[in-house]
């Protein structure tokens, strides 16, 4: 089989998760609504690609006519709120929904999504509105992109530990880093960002 693009993997994972939880495949509108695709034409293009590459077949004339070819292991990951890629903002931890992804893309247990707001990580390819897949962990290596909490406020930045301070570095040349000295406050690492998911249509 041909290799899938990340977007095609997301469509296939949602179909698999919907089949597992409901017992029948989703409609075009349900796929579009889940992935943020306006209209059915964009969804049909993804399904055409999946069928051409041998991952699905479709029964003509049926709104739920998608049939998986082989097994796809999908899992639904909770979206637990918004994290600002910019200035600090209060952490939001109420589950707002779920997003289905290929289980092979999930590295670790208890992973969750945070929706990115702001453009301080734009030069790392992380845009406002993206879903950041976060693996919970309390430590980070220099250069990791993390979700960090400072005094109950959360931010998404690149992490650096330097002598007596921690630097949370934006990936936007127009913005300054957040510097926290050891005696000025505590930085808690919520988790490491292991993937970014985006609606392309």
Swiss-Prot record:
The keyword Repressor belongs to this UniProt entry's keyword annotation: yes
Feature type site, description Cleavage: 85-86
Keyword DNA repair: yes
GO molecular function: DNA binding; serine-type endopeptidase activity
A Pfam family: Peptidase_S24
SUBUNIT field: Homodimer.
Family indicated by similarity: Belongs to the peptidase S24 family.
Name of the protein this chain belongs to: LexA repressor
Gene name for this UniProt entry: lexA
